[in-house]
């Protein structure tokens, strides 16, 4: 059963040695990663909740790892989790769904329901310093009658509010590091800690102490003086 990821109604690029080619491509959504709410930098900084969506391009393949053979290229979009009428996420959801959502539909929309959905993506290349990025410029519905080849990559979703730690450990380390800083993931981990170590947990009974007196006086050993073979001189 899919977890729920609703975006409120109201207001990036990947670099590898081989990047997805320019042009319009058949695509399938195969990863939706909720990165949680973190502090953002830049002109529009502040705390924002982000979600990363990865698109598999089944007709565009290359050898990235000789041991795995040919694999499809992928493209990635990073969204602010918002279904405001002017948000990029809502615009792309409309494109994939092939219809305009009502305000009520947008408010209840489960972003994770996009997993496995097919569409067309238009990719452009953008230069930044000495690196070239493959960016998704537009997303459009799959044309009627067009069939998308079977998926190559397994579908994967991750929620910071209902985290599956098995899935979490499969994510790239830099993605894990982002998630660990999110408000939602921190709150979840704190709740888990409280459940395992409740505040009202009984305090263990302290171990009693045994103090050895060091201020021994010579008179304490008076009974040891004299003939110890005579039992009448023992203190008992």
Model features per residue range: what roles?
Residues 1-236:
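Short beta-rich binding modules
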């Amino acid at each position: 059963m899919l977890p729920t990821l609703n975006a409120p109604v109201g207001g990036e690029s990947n670099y590898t040695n081989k990047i997805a080619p320019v042009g319009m491509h058949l695509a399938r959504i195969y990863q939706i990663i909720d990165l949680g709410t973190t502090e953002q930098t830049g002109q529009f900084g502040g705390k924002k909740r982000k979600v990363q969506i990865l698109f598999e391009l089944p007709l565009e393949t290359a050898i990235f790892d000789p041991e795995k053979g040919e694999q499809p290229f992928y493209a990635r979009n990073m969204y602010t989790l918002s279904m405001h009428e002017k948000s990029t996420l809502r615009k792309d959801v409309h494109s994939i769904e092939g219809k305009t959502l009502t305000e009520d539909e947008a408010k209840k929309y489960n972003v994770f329901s996009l997993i496995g959905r097919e569409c067309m993506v238009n990719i452009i290349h953008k230069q930044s310093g000495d690196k070239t990025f493959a960016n998704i410029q537009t997303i459009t519905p799959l044309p009627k009658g067009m069939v998308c080849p079977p998926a190559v990559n397994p579908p994967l979703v991750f929620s910071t509010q209902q985290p599956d730690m098995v899935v979490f450990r499969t994510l790239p380390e830099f993605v894990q590091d982002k998630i660990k800083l999110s408000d939602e993931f921190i709150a979840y981990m704190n709740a888990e800690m409280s459940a395992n170590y409740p505040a009202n947990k009984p305090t263990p009974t302290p171990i009693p102490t045994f103090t050895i007196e060091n201020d021994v006086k010579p008179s304490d050993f008076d009974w040891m003086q004299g003939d110890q073979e005579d039992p009448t001189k023992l203190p008992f």
